Amino acid sequence: MDTDYTDWISSFNEVDTTSLKICLKRKLADEIDYLQTVAGPDLQKFIQMVRHKYMIDNVINIIEGCKNKTAKEIIEARSEPLGYLPEISGLINLDVRKIDELYEDVLIDTEVGFYFSAFLEDVIANSEIKQISTINNYLQELKPEKIKNHLKKIWLEHFYQFSQTMNGTTREFMEDLLKFEADCQAIQIIYNSLAYDYNQFQEEERKKLIPYFGRLFK
């Protein structure tokens, strides 16, 4: 085998689909690392905001893994290389019995802390939850997938706001890409909700998770 991935793949005694997937993701992350180092300021910012999506995935993976007492090695193996965070090891070792403290004391200090901070503000603003103990109980019961969808909505809207600061063709391309991503999220949320009995409450809950832009947005 003579490709750009040869050195990576040769490190495995046997190449199965899982190992190959891990290898290719790491190689892709390395290539994007290089691209980011030689890019201009706007492209660097764009790439970094793309990576925020995978950082959010990694943090949610850690929260879910810790709550389920998943082995540290398995949690690390599931991490997306494109979403690498220096704080990952520290997060994995945290006691998540008080999950609100994890959000407030640790995640807000990470690069994607802005999204988690905005998420917590939304939780408090859109509910009767005011006491820290009540927030902790609420977050413990909330499914990680719903937290992730909420965070992705905040990320997409923040990314879209950034695209509006660009000019000309750059702005047009970024808008098209982000609208496509927003539509994909909207479709996924609606599809996942079809398993439940449809009612007015559920419709309102879905709207909270769908970005305010995109070709499907009304």
Residue ranges and their predicted role:
Residues M1-K218:
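N-terminal domain-start signal
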